[in-house]
Structure formats: structure tokens, C-alpha cells
Amino acid sequence: MTEAENRVTLGFEAEVKQLLHLMIHSLYGNKEIFLRELISNASDAADKLRFSALGNDALYEGDSRLRVRIEFDKAARTLSISDNGIGMTREEVQHNIGTIARSGTRHFFESLTGDEAKDSQLIGQFGVGFYSAFIVADKVVLETRKAGVPAEEGARWESSGEGSYTLETLTRPERGTRVTLHLREGEDEFLDGWKLRAIIRKFSDHISLPIEMKRETGEPKEGEEAPAEVWETVNSASALWAKNRDEITDEAYDEFYKHVSHDFQEPLARVHSRVEGTNEYTLLLYIPKHAPFDLWDRDSKRGVKLYVRKVFIMEDSDKLMPRYLRFVRGVIDSDSLPLNVSREILQENKQLEKIRGGAVKKVLGLLEDLANNEPEKYQAFWKEFGQVLKEGLIEDFANKDRLAKLLRFSSTHTDSEEQTVTLDEYVSRMKEGQDKIYFVSAESFGAARNSPHLEIFRKKDIEVLLLSDRIDEWLVSYLTEYEGKPLQSVARGDLDLGKLEGEEEKAEAAAEKEAFAPLTERLKKALEAKVNDVRLSHRLTDSPACLISESYGMSRTMERIMKSAGQNIPGSKPILEINPHHGLIARLNTEADQTRFQDLASLLLDQAVLAEGGQLDDPAEFVHKLNGLLQSLL
């Protein structure tokens, strides 16, 4: 390969250029974090080598003492962070550093506001890693070689962070990665050994890998030999989770969270526990304050790291946490699993299943503690992760009852979009004689709150849960009852209020049904292509009509959700309910002109579709008929 073929200049993805610009301008006030991020990357590289070497000891290449080294050169104005971890191939360098191959990237950039304070928080949630070097450097050089490949297959990457980078192959005897920062003018504080040591102890003291710096001895006197280089370990280099809880400060806990999560903010809550017995393990788990941008990527592997006797094994969240707890971050360290455990063995490992089950119980216990003792914190959690936690009712039957108590809903009692109502609170407010938990589902809070199906419930002051999250339709198909009380949709099947309806009301309804039987039959015939039946409604007090589903059929909301997702759902016809006390229905009951009756019936059905948040099959026809009706009134 010629030099021209070996050395190539490539452009960053547009997202990388935007991220670099944002970091330099938004994170400068917290610029020390670049060192934490680069040390964290080096630590991850060492973890990956340890795991790979479990099956191939030759990857250590005779050097199994893993460490991170920090060096600076005042004359050259450079700061270097090097490790002897797994390293990268040239192709991996191009993929990992030239692009942002991460779910949620587009949503991240759409969320940026232009407000530096807010954007810096968003950037912290997204995680910047390697790119943070450009906060203090105007040029960054990375040299690396992957463990187990020949020295001639190293790679060198260089960029000034302005839109492009160069990449070339080089000979590198040392395994691992070295990142050299050419510091900007005014960043001299990062050329001070004492300052660097202070930053390391502040941000990275908890890392179990030794972080080393050369002992500073000063310039030798004339005629004296320069003293031999001595590397000193700066951090405590012990696994934080292995310490007793009373030995760990809140600050140390928070910094460890930032290390394992690559989040810039402190966590919302944590649990640190040691489980002893036949299956011994330690866990240190955190709940973030904010949802990561890949929260809805169910295939994301980031989450909880598994260690065996302080040796990193994997970061594969669904092996250690169910998918509905994929937001949890932290570590689990087992004393009982074999050190040479493989991912294949872990698939069916009973010990790991018990560890997973125990970890889930600890997380649910932490959430219960927040809900009972720190409701404001729990409400902050619910706002970020509530929709994900709802998946647990579908996935985790064993913990279904515990999860049900953690649910929060909007309801007609609070009349607020904020989901604060528990099922226990709902049950405590149930009317005398009420034996069901009522809910209405819609595709938005506004549509649920203004649903015509609520009218009789508002009149009788009966609370109804307002469900508008996309997962809610699946939720209520699994959560069919709570504390012996069935959940009942107010928009499905015949409405039976039982003891909430007096005998006089029931007698009046029976009389109305008989009196309006000719009209319901006439409407049913006029709309037979679009509705399955026409009935008198006991739900409506103000609206002329509404649509309902059969008791055991798919709900109207679920049909729309499935169709919007591209699912081929067999068409089903709804039931049209009419309000016998509404003026429009009274007018229809006396309409003799069949053409006019047909138009009014179509308009009645179409407005019922619109009232529930649906879409018309033929909006133009609706407008045409409505205009005709309006003209006839002039």
C-alpha cells in the first residue's frame, strides 16, 4: 500500500460535526469531564480485554497487568491518556469515532433548544465519550492496535474537530490505545500534575483499574543523572461496590454512576446490597434522573454490567434486567458464577436467573420506597420511565401485583394530564355500590378527557381513569382486575352501572328503548354498511351520539394504533349509540324525507368518529353534506 493509499482524509457525519460544535460551546463550563470520559473509555477497553482473554489468554501478549496512564508535556502542550486494553482495528476506529451509530440520535438532535444550559444537560444524557476531548483540545491524535493482531496493523486517527479526520495504518508494538490532546491556548491547568491528580481523584477514584502518573522529581542538578521513571497509582483502584456502604460518600456513589452510565447528572436513586448464601453477589444499581435517548430501543445492550469476582463479563441488559427495567444502570458482581463463564452458558444458567430475580426485587423495592416515602421523586421517575414500567405488567407476571401498585394514571378526579393517581387511591374514592374500575382510552389526553363516553360518569361524579399512552391498550388487556375489582372500559359493550343506577332510571331507559325502537331500526338500515348496530345510549348526556366496541372485540383506539403501525387489521364495524334527549336525535325521529334523513344519519356517524379522535374515510363528502345542511337552514 502506498502512503497515499494508506493515509486517507474522511469527513465526519453531519451529526458528529454538530455534536462537536455543541460540546465546545455548551460544556466548557464543566470542561474537566473530558478526562473522566477518556479514562472511562480506557477502563471499558480493559474490561473488554479481560473478558476476551478468558477464552484466549494469548491476547494479553505477556502483559496482563492492565492500567491507564496519564502523561503531559508542558513544552509540547500535550496531554496523553493511554491504556493497554483491547485496542481497535482501523475499521473499528472509523466506525466508532467517525460516526455516531446509536439509536435515538435523530431524536437527540431534534430535542436541542439552542439554550446552552438545557442543551448541556441533553448532551450529558446522550453521552459524548471520546468527543469530549475537543472541549480543551484543538487537535486530537489517537493511536491504537487491537490485541492479538500484528504490530503492523495499528491505526492512527487525527482531527482538529472541524469536519474531517485523517486515518492511516501504522506499526505499533504496544497493544491498546493512546489518545493525545494538543491543548488549546489557555488550558495550561491541564499541564499541571497536581491539578490532574486532583481531577482523577475527584472523578475516577472509584475505577478498579490503576490510573498511573509519573512521579514528579523536578529537574536534576548539573552533573546528576536523571532519576529513573517511577509510575505511581493515583486512584484508590478498588471496586467501589465491594466496599461497605458506610465507607462510601454520596459524592463517590454519584461519580461511579456517571462512570457506568456516561451520564453527566447525578442519579435519582440507588440501591447497594450484598446477598449472601449459596448464590453470593453484590449489586449497585441506579435509577437515572432522565430517560436516555435509546430508551425505546428494546435491543440496546447498555444497562447493567456483570462481573465475576471483579472481572468484567458482559453488559447485556436483558440477561440481568427484564426489558421493562432497561433504564437501570449499575453493576452486579457474582462470587458464585465460574470465572470462565461464556455467554452461551449464561443463556440457561440457573444461578444467573436467581441473581436476575433478586436484582428485580431490589429495584422494585427501591421504587416502592420512593413511592411511599419520597412521592415527589417518584413522580419525577414516573414522568421519565412510567410508560416503560407499564411493560412489566405484560412481561412479568410474577411481579404483577407489585407493579400494579406502582402505576400512576390521569383521571377525571384530578382532571390533569399529569399521571398521579394510584389504583389504591381510585379504589378508596369509589362510590357506594360501585364494583368496577372505569377507564377510557384515547390517542391523546385531550381526546380522553373530552370523550363523550364520560358524560354520564361526570354527571354522577364517578371517577374514570384517562388512558392515553400507546401502551395502555395492551396494559388493560393484561391488568383486567385490581384488588378483586374488574377494570371496565366506558366505551365497550352495554353500560351497566349496577347499583349506581336507580330503579327509576332503569325503568325510564326501558321505556325510551321501546319508544325509539323505530328510529334505531331506521338508522341501522341507513348506516348498515358502516355500523354493526344502533342502540340508545345511557352514557350520553350532552352529545348526540358516540361509537362503542363490542365487549370482547378490539377497541376502537387499539384498531387505530395497529393501523397506524402498518398492521393489516380486519375491518370491524362499531356500534352507534344515540342520545334520546338530544335535539338532533329528536329532529331525526320526525324526519320524513328519506334523502335528508340519510344525510343527517351520515353526519351523525361522522361527528361521532371525530369526537373519539378518529379519521373520516371521506372528509370531502362530510363537508359537502354539512354545507348542504347549513344552506338549508339559511
UniProtKB/Swiss-Prot annotation:
One of its GO terms (cellular component) is cytoplasm. Keywords: ATP-binding, Chaperone, Cytoplasm, Nucleotide-binding, Stress response. It comes from Methylococcus capsulatus (strain ATCC 33009 / NCIMB 11132 / Bath). InterPro entries: HATPase_C_sf (IPR036890), Heat_shock_protein_90_CS (IPR019805), HSP90_C (IPR037196), Hsp90_fam (IPR001404), Hsp90_N (IPR020575), Ribosomal_Su5_D2-typ_SF (IPR020568). Belongs to the heat shock protein 90 family. PROSITE patterns: HSP90. This is Chaperone protein HtpG. Homodimer. Residues 1-343 are annotated as: A. It is found in: Cytoplasm. Residues 561-634 are annotated as: C. Molecular chaperone. Has ATPase activity.
